[in-house]
Amino acid sequence: VKSTNLMAFVATKMLERQEDLDTCTEMQVEKMKTSTKARLRTESSFAPRTWEDAIKDGELLFNGTILQAESPTMTPASVEMKGKKFPIDFAPSNIAPIGQNPIYLSPCIPNFDGNVWEATMYHHRGATLTKTMNCNCFQRTIWCHPNSSRMRLSYAFVLYCRNTKKICGYLIARQVAGIETGIRKCFRCIKSGFVMATDEISLTILQSIKSGAQLDPYWGNETPDIDKTEAYMLSLRETGP
């Protein structure tokens, strides 16, 4: 039911941006909307609700109304792959938070070398997770913007650090087998807490990220507390982890 509501919300919001979609993409979104309505009718026997109700519930699951955001004003990011650095393009996008799971709200743990954008990339069945090495903060948001170079859409769930007020990572589903498939991959990755990888090393890193969020003494904070986080990290430097 929740997945259907989320898909209803995503399809509706994407169709509101038809001017950004090419013909092929628009047809795929319409197909996704049709299949979601069919699922809604199937579920009506045990979870009766209207299409409008599904959209509203999907919006609540995303925890807020989608906002039109400008390009973030921050240091340009880059990702190193095979010895080469590639810039990360933070284009104007629609941003909306997804949920308030406390495990994903741990304070950020910054590096002390000042390198905010040291990043690594993980791949899993068509989805790519880019995670900066200096942050253990998971404020989940959706970031959906058109990729003008290929005239297609990329779907990215952004991890936003609530302490440094900067983007700390994101999960992208490439348009391989259709829009609906790509978005579902993103949902599955987020629900699993990112404990997935294609090799043992990446799996170990991702597991440590998730366990670190649970073990950090400040992970339950409802509001950012940069002073406490910095003091905690300084104590670790002085006494050792």
From Swiss-Prot:
One of its Pfam families is Flu_C_NS1
Q: Which domain of life is it from?
A: Viruses
Record's keyword annotation contains Ribonucleoprotein:
no
Is-annotated flag, keyword Lipid metabolism? no
- Location relative to the cell: Host cytoplasm; Host nucleus
Q: Which GO terms describe its cellular component?
A: host cell cytoplasm; host cell nucleus
Q: Which UniProt keywords apply?
A: Host cytoplasm, Host nucleus
What does the UniProt function comment say about this protein?
A: Suppresses the RNA silencing-based antiviral response in Drosophila cells.
Q: What is this protein called?
A: Non-structural protein 1
Q: Which organism is it from?
A: Influenza C virus (strain C/Great lakes/1167/1954)
